[in-house]
Amino acid sequence: QIKRRRLEQGMQSLGSTRGAGGHGQNPFAALISPETDEDHGTVYAMNFVYSGNFLAGAEVDMHQNTRFQMGIHPFDFAWTVLPGERFQAPEAVMVYSGQGLGRMSRIFHKLYRDCLIPARFARRERPVLLNSWEANYFDFHKEGLVSLAGEAARVGAELFVLDDGWFGKRNDTTSSVGDWAPNEEKLGGTLPELIRDIEDKGIAFGLWFEPEMVSPDSDLYRAHPEWVIQVQGRRLEMSRDEYVLDLSNPEVCDYIIESIGRILGSCHIVYVKWDMNRNFTNMGSGYLSADRQKEQAHRYMLGLYRVMETLTGRFPEVLFESCAGGGGRCDPGMLYYMPQVWISDDTDAMERLRMQYGSSLIYPSLVMGCHISEVPNH
């Protein structure tokens, strides 16, 4: 939702140290004249082309001059630049409008469609999809999935998405994230066989992953407990029954590329929902040296971008949708790799209208994923 604050002397800011923008703040801010509306008023806006920790601020000094800034959040961040090296900071898009917020939005939309979103998706109409989550949660079997896909196709849906629960021993939130091997007993056969039966109903197939996380009860964690973000010698903090993998470690990134790539290369998957259901806590890396620990959060993002660069290059026709427990990671950095964003887990139709309107202030409506769901919303 759009929030306005009156500038006063001193510093006002918004930001995140969660490892992503978060649900309460997007890496966007604008200075506007008080009377600004959709069609009138002066706007100076910035949007950070980055998916990690950020800080945006406006400082009014004693002479009523305003300094407007945006960048990587300085909290717990440092970077060692050795002789001959350089550090490249993320960029911010700056937009001026003398014709209100509407003009600002149109500039952002055109720029992102023309220059940021992958060209093959920049103007492609998105498929109408049915996601299995609120229909089945973890409780499903092959016959039910195929039947649901058939009903979706009958009413005009073009894509059936199998959400959480298809891999490892995953029947609730407590296990198997990181073990990206299909549960053939639960699926009633191989994943390619399930996809074939669903496609026979006249509908395409998509799949859910949460590649940046790992369950304590998983083969991956048992093999590599050192791969998670953790303060050495301290108790690990869990959220949603999972830990965050340390993507500052190239081995972790290579594992994600290999395991997700193996699934995508084995069958006909046209869409991936890429989820991130928890934030960073207890930052620490077993891979980085003691004097480089404050580089971890940014190195994580560089690792994630390498993963996405590799996978989207290898599977250019797969539509990747960014999800972070809803819209917790919606930013231009993600849009470069994932041209669709799941705006919120709240799919109440009236509430969603407000969210879609707020998101459209910056991002084209083309990128916003939205479900039709039961009322009241789960």
Per-range role (PLM):
Residues 1-112, 350:
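N-terminal accessory beta-strand-rich subdomains and adjacent acidic, glycine-rich linkers
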Residues 51, 94, 135, 212, ...:
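Short, glycine-/Ser/Thr-/acidic-enriched flexible segments
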Residues 76, 144, 190, 303-304:
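Residue-level preference for nonpolar/small residues embedded in alpha-helices
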Residues 104-109, 145, 334-336:
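Composition- and surface-driven signal marking solvent-exposed, interaction-prone regions
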Residues 121-257, 271:
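Aromatic-lined carbohydrate-binding/catalytic grooves of carbohydrate-active enzymes
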Residues 137, 164, 168, 175, ...:
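Active-site and adjacent substrate-binding regions of carbohydrate-active enzymes
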Residues 215-254, 258, 298-378:
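Glycan-recognition surfaces
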